[in-house]
Amino acid sequence: MSQLCPCGSAVEYSLCCHPYVSGEKVAPDPEHLMRSRYCAFVMQDADYLIKTWHPSCGATALRAELIAGFAHTEWLGLTVFEHCWQDGGNIGFVSFVARFTEGGKTGAIIERSRFLKENGQWYYIDGTRPQFGRNDPCPCGSGKKFKKCCGQ
């Protein structure tokens, strides 16, 4: 039986993010890398997450922390709401909302992730968490106020 990709693309996992997570292909752009990294969190694949972090970030030191977090977190969904490139296409940004439950509580990560392309491969560098007012429209595009959507 086929399984839809956890990244929210509505495409089968085997045709979507699996080729990147398995190492068969290299993600062609920051959005594909971000979606495949989300899948790696869902599938609890610390190796892929570390491999796709830029080497300067020292992600191998985070292995134990990543693995410990897997046991307590259930990922519920991903919404990408913006992506763009700079510096001749070698720096990319992807803004998203990732919903999860942890310890019985529902939460959301809202982030603008930064990616760098080196030697034909994209790497995750870091992310910023934009601040939204409670009455601002939710960035996920639901049409609801932030406080009634991802800000809960």
UniProtKB/Swiss-Prot annotation:
Source organism superkingdom: Bacteria
* Cross-referenced InterPro entries: NTF2-like_dom_sf (IPR032710), SEC_C_motif (IPR004027), UPF0225 (IPR023006), YchJ-like_M (IPR048469)
Q: Which Pfam families match?
A: SEC-C, YchJ_M-like
> Per the UniProt record, which residue ranges are transmembrane?
none
Instruction: Return the Gene3D superfamilies for the record.
Output: 3.10.450.50
Task: Output the HAMAP family linked to this UniProt entry.
Answer: UPF0225
Please report which protein family the annotation says this sequence is part of. Belongs to the UPF0225 family.
Q: Which NCBIfam families match?
A: PRK01617.1, PRK01752.1
The name on file for this protein is: UPF0225 protein YchJ
- Source organism per entry reads Escherichia coli O6:K15:H31 (strain 536 / UPEC)
| Phylogenetic classification of the source organism | Bacteria, Pseudomonadati, Pseudomonadota, Gammaproteobacteria, Enterobacterales
Name of the coding gene = ychJ
